[in-house]
Amino acid sequence: MKHTLVIVGAGLAGLSAALTAVKNGWTVKLVSSLASERAQSVMAEGGINAALNTKGEEDSPEQHYTDTLTAACGLADPNAVWGMTQAASELVRSLHHLGVQFNVTDDDELDLRNFGGQKKKRTAFAQSDTGKQLMTALIDAVRREESAGTVERFPHHKFRTLLLSGNICGGCTVQDTYTGELLRFVCDAVLIATGGLHGLFGDTTGSLANTGEVTAELFRLGVPMANLEMIQYHPTTVELGEKRMLLSEAARGEGGRLFALRNGKPWLSLIHISEPT
């Protein structure tokens, strides 16, 4: 008997989780308030880090681990960072195999570039639209699973609440944003992959659809939470009309500097750090 997983959120995390669950024998119901093509993940520009060592710099997952902990200033979970850095290279290669159009060198190796806080070039990228390329490949893969009957997608459905019996979650309720119909999903597990909370802020480079309402409902239900203060801000933007457009971290990774004025004088200068301190 197959287990059923409901995933709330169909961006990079939700799609990846769906494919992983199917690979491990689960069936998946994939719920999202918008189509995957409009997820925040599509907007990611810069790249994805892994110690692939295609530049002959003698890079390694251990160095990736050390750089990441250093850049985190003691706030990162060492066990989580170790797992991520050990798995990163194989994950990036599997994404390339899945169809992500990463930049490659003349020798047909994955190209790598600098990002902030790392000693070696270890950022794989797809021109300036890495997120879009990642999402395109993952969406295609999930649609193949949908055709096979292992994934059922529910775009334009909003999460409303969990179905709880004491401390046991037995499913969730979602609502069709067009018809208002409520659907009750009974399942073996619910995975929340709804992204950040930046839609709460007046000025953001992210999608305004990321309102944080799912997190708020989970908080109301008493679901244990951690690291809610870890909201990333992006220091390079261009203001166009009412929306802040993101300038990739790659601009700083290649040596670009950021100057902010206070009383007409530069007071903040962020430069690419070739050796984390």
What are these regions (language model features)?
Residues 200-217:
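A conserved FAD-binding loop/helix module that cradles the flavin
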Residues 11-12, 35, 129, 197-198:
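Residue-level detector of alpha-helix initiation sites
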Residues 50-84:
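Glycine-rich active-site loop/strand segments that organize a redox cofactor
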Residues 23-44:
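Glycine-rich FAD pyrophosphate-binding loop
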Residues 67, 76, 82-120, 256-260:
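A conserved beta-strand/loop capping segment in the N-terminal third of enzymes
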